[in-house]
């Protein structure tokens, strides 16, 4: 006997299916389910009178043959697709994406549920990979709480706390600081990796930082990003299979953007602040988007361009870079970095896939808890101002959604050599997953899983008779306690450091994972974000021309994902 359900009734019971569309928060972005892995009439759902019961949707298989956790009927939004599926997690990793149930009595089951299986109800929820923020100033450890609550599960950058150098640059300088920061990483339920200081003209000061555990090196203009330092740093990176991140020379003291590109010598580099106001060669750092060896990112303070963007930037810049507004040269330095024309162009370059990544620049002009919000606000603004992308249809914004989610998930992972572990929802990867109600997508996750275990969730009064009574707010869960913390989060290091046994020498509790394949990644590998336009910036007007087209747009006067979500 069969029962025909309306689409609305089906979606309310099991979540949306193929052909259904979902609005992301209060934006103008609509995603459409491309495929449903479940079988109609054989869906599994937990609860009283529901399917996942002994002898029904739950089989008799032992723990070795079933997942530890199944997320049922979830909508997966990832760079590779937008699908409805059950997600299996085993030993902290994504084990399968498919159809869960009891294979002894149900057809088409690819994920067997057993008595050893926990269930998370994903009906009506969107699941994304945990975000990766590659531009962290480790100024305060409390940033980690904010980042995790926003859906970020991996933080890469440098620093030692609120030291003056860290306030301005993302460097953890020297072996002693590197060891201390790696030891500190054991205390936080998030994946961490640290960049050493790359500003030196001889190899040994850099090699010793890689050997101490750095995942790469950071060149920053405040330490002197000269062509000699760039060349030396990239040579060390090539020898150690690590990445280099660079904040280029705003003042053009040691050369112009062409000098910096020449110093790259075609070698792979992650260019921070490839943007309209964050720093680097003024006014034309955007030119580097056209280089095959350059992996460009921008940061969230200029995302997206609004009527308030320019006003807040001057004071932020003066504080972050230890400048004095009473000194004319310092003021001129700051003003040279803030250009409305290049900020506007940054919006469009993101939308067309020329800028491959988006990060925070935490407490150093950027907001650590707003990477994901600002990404989707930019996508919304571009949809409203520029319409559908050529790859999309009138029904949905699927390609645009895949392009923007890739900017803070898979592309940062590929850039920094950690894509074998994190960055996407694929079997074999670490189960860092973020669950969202569509109305709160990108803003306030319902639950964050780290290594397959719930680390943070919206939870009501712990003394209440049920989980939901107010006050409901984010509370740390069991993955953040005791020995579970070290077994559900990762610390990324160089292969050189791992081979040298730093885990034992430093007494680290977390599993260390070496980065790899950092030197052979190119712009062509940046998923959905590989466009390499020929860019010029007028030195007088700051107009940005890409492949012969003027890139300009109006500032937004109002944004979604903003005040209506943060009244309390």
Swiss-Prot record:
Keyword tags: Cytoplasm, Hydrolase, Metal-binding, Nickel
UniProt-listed InterPro entries: Amidohydro-rel, Metal-dep_hydrolase_composite, Metal_Hydrolase, Urease_alpha_N_dom, Urease_alpha_subunit, Urease_AS, Urease_asu, Urease_asu_c
Family note: Belongs to the metallo-dependent hydrolases superfamily. Urease alpha subunit family.
UniProt modified residues of type N6-carboxylysine: 218
Keyword Secreted among record annotations: no
Active site residues per record: 321
UniProt GO cellular component terms: cytoplasm
One Pfam family from the record: Urease_alpha
Main localization (coarse): cytoplasm
Origin: domain of life: Bacteria
Residues that bind Ni(2+) 2: 218, 247, 273
Cofactor note: Binds 2 nickel ions per subunit.
PANTHER family named in the record: UREASE
PROSITE patterns named in the record: UREASE_1, UREASE_2, UREASE_3
Binding site for substrate: 220
Protein name: Urease subunit alpha
Membrane-spanning residues: none
Subunit organization: Heterotrimer of UreA (gamma), UreB (beta) and UreC (alpha) subunits. Three heterotrimers associate to form the active enzyme.
Localisation: Cytoplasm
GO molecular function: nickel cation binding; urease activity
Catalytic activity: urea + 2 H2O + H(+) = hydrogencarbonate + 2 NH4(+)
PTMs per UniProt: Carboxylation allows a single lysine to coordinate two nickel ions.
Cofactor dependency: Ni cation
GO biological process: urea catabolic process
